[in-house]
């Protein structure tokens, strides 16, 4: 949630930026970042360590040589046992306030997000699960799972259609435990 405002501020200062995912919280923020890079004439890079792997370059070669062509459907999944959050759709309200640790500047951590009372459920790896702070499993892993498709098959364009087929553990506060998109 803080990558966008920090990157915007740095570009306004004329600084080149390297930003790890999640880059932004919305397509609008991504568009604003691209426009700011052009406006301020700075170099930008989104970090994705997958671009350093052999399989990334191998897939690129497969597309360029025609081994992979005429793709009409992509199915990507992540079945790693890592938990995304502990609530599994049972969360009825936001967590109650806790004492802010002396080592944390909570207002700075919130960045541009609307005020929330501090809870340890928002920090460390848990921030990824909350709509206000993270981007869920798809935001964390989608960049890795569909990066080659986006880069080499769609050539940087967006897909024509994305359908939600399943959202397990959906809640108005946190992202689903898993989802199926087509």
Which residues does each PLM region occupy?
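Beta-strand-loop-alpha-helix segment that lines the small-molecule cofactor/substrate pocket
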Residues: 4-52, 64-66
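Short, solvent-exposed loop/turn and secondary-structure capping segments
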Residues: 4-9, 29-30, 56-57, 84-90, ...
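Structural recognition of the beta-strand scaffold that forms the well-ordered cores
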Residues: 18-19, 25, 43-46, 72-76, ...
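A generic secondary-structure signal for well-formed alpha-helical elements
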Residues: 15, 34-37, 41, 63-71, ...
């Amino acid at each position: 949630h803080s990558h966008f405002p920090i990157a915007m501020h740095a570009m306004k200062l004329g600084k080149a930026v390297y930003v790890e995912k999640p880059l932004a919280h919305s397509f609008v923020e991504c568009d604003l970042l691209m426009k700011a890079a052009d406006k301020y004439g700075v170099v930008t890079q989104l970090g994705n360590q997958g671009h350093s792997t052999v399989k990334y370059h191998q897939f690129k070669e497969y597309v360029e040589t025609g081994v992979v062509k005429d793709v009409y459907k992509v199915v990507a999944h992540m079945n790693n046992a890592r938990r995304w959050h502990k609530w599994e759709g049972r969360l009825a309200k936001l967590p109650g306030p806790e004492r802010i640790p002396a080592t944390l500047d909570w207002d700075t951590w919130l960045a541009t997000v609307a005020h929330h009372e501090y809870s340890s459920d928002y920090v460390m790896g848990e921030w990824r699960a909350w709509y206000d702070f993270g981007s869920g499993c798809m935001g964390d892993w989608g960049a890795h799972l569909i990066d080659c498709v986006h880069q080499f098959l769609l050539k940087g364009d967006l897909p024509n259609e994305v359908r939600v087929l399943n959202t397990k553990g959906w809640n108005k506060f946190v992202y689903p435990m898993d989802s199926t998109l087509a």
